[in-house]
């Protein structure tokens, strides 16, 4: 579809051991970095430590409070990448019928595009990083 290999493979949507093994095998076979998923533990990706934060499953989810939590963690552990996992984006019929994150997705978009979020990020002097940038830095 994109006429190039993906920058990395990750599969947190389907929590199946067989799926995860298959995804790791495909990543290995095609020499594509694999990003493991564990919201309860630090993970390593391309030589960097990542601490994931995904709180949008809670009933009282507040993405601004989650961002504040992530920024506080980043201040305390600057040598570790604090990974804020959001689910913003397009809502099609399949997602509307099957996702538990329909409402949190709208909250994520609102927060991620808000002036308040930008100001919070700037105040903490946080550098936003894409996974592809971690892949590129590991190759260098």
Task: List each language-model region with its residue ranges.
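Catalytic domains of cell-wall/extracellular-matrix polysaccharide-remodeling enzymes
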Residues: 1-54, 58, 75
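C-terminal domain-boundary segment and adjacent tail
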Residues: 98-140
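Short amphipathic alpha-helical segments and helix-helix/interface helices
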Residues: 20-24, 68-72, 117-118
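A short, acidic, amphipathic alpha-helical segment used as a generic capping/interface helix at domain edges
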Residues: 61-79
């Amino acid at each position: 579809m994109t006429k190039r290999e993906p920058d990395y493979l990750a599969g947190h949507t389907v929590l199946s051991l067989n799926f995860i093994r298959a995804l790791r095998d495909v990543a290995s076979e095609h020499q594509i970095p694999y990003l493991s998923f564990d919201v309860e533990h630090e993970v390593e990706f391309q030589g960097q430590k990542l601490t994931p934060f995904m709180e949008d499953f809670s009933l009282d989810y507040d993405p601004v409070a989650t961002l504040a939590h992530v920024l506080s963690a980043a201040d305390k552990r600057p040598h570790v990448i604090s990974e804020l996992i959001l689910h913003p984006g397009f809502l099609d019929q399949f997602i509307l019928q099957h996702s538990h994150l329909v409402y949190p997705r709208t909250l994520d978009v609102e927060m991620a595009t808000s002036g308040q979020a930008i100001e919070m990020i700037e105040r903490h002097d946080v550098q936003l990083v894409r996974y592809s940038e971690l892949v590129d830095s590991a190759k260098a």
